Amino acid sequence: MKQLTIYPGKLTLDELRQVYLQPVKITLDSQIFPAIERSVECVNAILAENRTAYGINTGFGLLASTRIEEDNLEKLQRSLVVSHAAGVGKALDDNMTRLIMVLKINSLSRGYSGIRLAVIQALIALVNAEIYPHIPCKGSVGASGDLAPLAHMSLLLLGEGQARYQGEWLPAKEALAKANLQPITLAAKEGLALLNGTQVSTAFALRGLFEAEDLLAAAIVCGSLSVEAALGSRKPFDARVHVVRGQQGQIDVAALYRHVLEESSELSDSHINCPKVQDPYSLRCQPQVMGACLTQLRHAADVILTEANAVSDNPLVFAEQGEVISGGNFHAEPVAMASDNLALVLAEIGALSERRIALLMDSHMSQLPPFLVENGGVNSGFMIAQVTAAALASENKALAHPASVDSLPTSANQEDHVSMAPAAGRRLWEMAENTRGILAIEWLSACQGIDFRNGLKSSPILEEARVILRAKVDYYDQDRFFAPDIDAAVKLLAEQHLSSLLPSGQILQRKNNR
């Protein structure tokens, strides 16, 4: 099992991707322990001095003015967790649940939440034992924290609800017992600290970010294959074109296209003296469009990584000053807007890919047989595959509508503006699936087109991309059941067979090579 030491507030995107992809063994940097203890001491001092502080000895939301007596404080925290566990929908998978839990551990360990180290260690023990709480995927509006899903996460600590252990859903107490763990009792402030926060919104956005990064890389390879299949020019990828514009994302993407295409190939040499002056935009403007996508991807990554390391609790405990301050760090507007940007990225990757597919189908544009098949008429070839790509691209356009501009007041108008960040992040998963389907069809189409070019070879990287596909999907000499071939290409894309052809870490890394 992968080992990960959490230095609170310093998680990297690579570490978060590892957490998402596979189980991890968590340890917490012991240097943060004193800060955690000081925040608890501050909470205890407020109680000892009989001061009123929101979330410590008051009700919540519109009931914040209700003072809670000391003998009810433990009950208050338990009641908060069980009452707020009101989510609906399918349970999140282990990968998403683990990522949420690690994000919560990271945030609580910063030492501003007034929660005991023992509670944080109890969460760590769950991650290390691979016991995952039942968290429904819907029920948060991304303001006042992701209350419902984080309440479902916290139920497991109390021995309530359900948990998945070794692939089986069990009552929480039974799952804990199988791993030799015990339920805990929450002290003042601790239930609220567990529930308040943007960790679910951030985890949803992180998955979308990881998907978008992989798909952008795959799109560069697919787009390069289409350039070769359509006998397109390499000149639009010349570094000089992009340097004079100065858009860094465009500069960096053009460099990746040049890396994939190389200076020339047998295919490019075959039409070096052709009369064609300019290629259609879907071929020629790939660096401009994909470069803009990369710029948005990088911005979203910066925002989401900042939030992954943020303290998004409320109220916050500033132990050195002995103060507890109510604020609004639980409002996930930055994450919602970042997710909206990622939605644009995914929609545009798919939209441009679909246009290249359509170009390859059109014999007047590509100089290839209509619908990429011999004996057209008897055979329909890729005709309906392009229709499928168009359907997916169109669906993504609807899904790309910004969620962050929506808001519905909650909690009797106390929480009168919300971010809708969870919905903004969750729809990215469906958009990524759609975009992967479009790219799969382009991969199939471009390889079929190259197969019509009299055995001429492309660049080494693109030849490898063809070999990978042809190991699973044969050349189309006549019509056959098409869907399994798309599924095979989708599976190869999901396994990162194309994105891995680019140099490691080259998508989000900035070059500064103007």
From Swiss-Prot:
HAMAP family: His_ammonia_lyase
Name this protein carries in UniProt: Histidine ammonia-lyase
InterPro entries, per the entry: Aromatic_Lyase, Fumarase/histidase_N, HutH, L-Aspartase-like, Phe/His_NH3-lyase_AS
Annotated EC: 4.3.1.3
Main location: cytoplasm
PANTHER family linked: HISTIDINE AMMONIA-LYASE
Residues found modified as 2,3-didehydroalanine (Ser): 144
Gene Ontology MF annotations: histidine ammonia-lyase activity
Pathway(s) annotated for this protein in UniProt: Amino-acid degradation; L-histidine degradation into L-glutamate; N-formimidoyl-L-glutamate from L-histidine: step 1/3
Gene: hutH
Cross-link 5-imidazolinone (Ala-Gly) residue location(s): 143-145
Keywords per UniProt: Cytoplasm, Histidine metabolism, Lyase
Recorded catalytic activity of this chain's protein: L-histidine = trans-urocanate + NH4(+)
UniProt source species: Photorhabdus laumondii subsp. laumondii (strain DSM 15139 / CIP 105565 / TT01)
Gene Ontology CC annotations of this record: cytoplasm
